[in-house]
Amino acid sequence: MVNYPHQLKGKKANPTPFKTKKSTVDFANRGMSFEAAINATNDYYLSRGIAVIHKKPTPIQIVKVDYPKRSRAKIVEAYFRQASTTDYSGVYKGLYIDFEAKETRQKTAMPMKNFHLHQIEHMASVLDQKGICFVLLHFSTLKETYYLPAKALIDFFQIDKGNKSMPLDYIKKNGYEIIQGAFPQVPYLDIIEQNFLGGDYN
């Protein structure tokens, strides 16, 4: 039985969506990938003392190592291993932040093949410890980005494991659209503040 954080107990994931003026800024038009935009956002938060959130390194399986010199080793063959948890983690206002980021070119749904059981289990464990856990979902063709609480993702995964994709309508109903900005590009802390903490990080 997963005990979700107190911020999510007894309330729908999207009771009063936080709305801001629609921005015309699009990080893709500036030659940035979704991941790069998130990293730039985290750098912005860090440089201003707002939050400390970093991308977790991708685990690597080393297969072959050469030793051209006794004092120097050279990796000549290695493979990326499947990540065991999520993409990002850190601290904001004393709260543990943990999230995954996914992107798709589809217009109506997010492929569930992008999520693995061990990631779902990790998110549930974070919620058990009262952490703030969520996924950032970017629809590149639509140029839309959403914050979906981990609870909503876990519920969908548990109820409809055989479904090949999560409908955009479900994401809109249970999540929050993130309005892209110039600085930061993906202001996801705005969603946390306005909908879960009820404050302002500025």
From Swiss-Prot:
Subcellular location: Cytoplasm
Site keyed Transition state stabilizer: positions: 102
Coiled-coil regions, chain positions: none
CDD domains reported for this sequence: RecU-like (cd22354)
Keywords associated with the record: Cytoplasm, DNA damage, DNA recombination, DNA repair, Endonuclease, Hydrolase, Magnesium, Metal-binding, Nuclease
Cofactor(s) the protein requires to work: Mg(2+)
Residues that, per the record, bind Mg(2+): 85, 87, 100, 119
GO biological process, one term: chromosome segregation
NCBIfam families named in the record: PRK02234.1-1, PRK02234.1-5, recU
Protein name, UniProt field: Holliday junction resolvase RecU
Annotated GO CC locations: cytoplasm
EC number: 3.1.21.10
Role noted for this protein: Endonuclease that resolves Holliday junction intermediates in genetic recombination. Cleaves mobile four-strand junctions by introducing symmetrical nicks in paired strands. Promotes annealing of linear ssDNA with homologous dsDNA. Required for DNA repair, homologous recombination and chromosome segregation.
Pfam family, one: RecU
Family that this chain belongs to: Belongs to the RecU family.
Disulfide bonds listed in the record: none
Single GO MF descriptor: nucleic acid binding
Organism field: Streptococcus uberis (strain ATCC BAA-854 / 0140J)
Entry annotated with the keyword Magnesium: yes
Cofactor binding: number and manner: Binds 1 Mg(2+) ion per subunit.
Main location: cytoplasm
Keyword DNA repair: yes
InterPro entries recorded: Resolv_RecU, Restrct_endonuc-II-like, tRNA_endonuc-like_dom_sf
Catalytic activity, reaction form: Endonucleolytic cleavage at a junction such as a reciprocal single-stranded crossover between two homologous DNA duplexes (Holliday junction)
Top-level lineage group: Bacteria
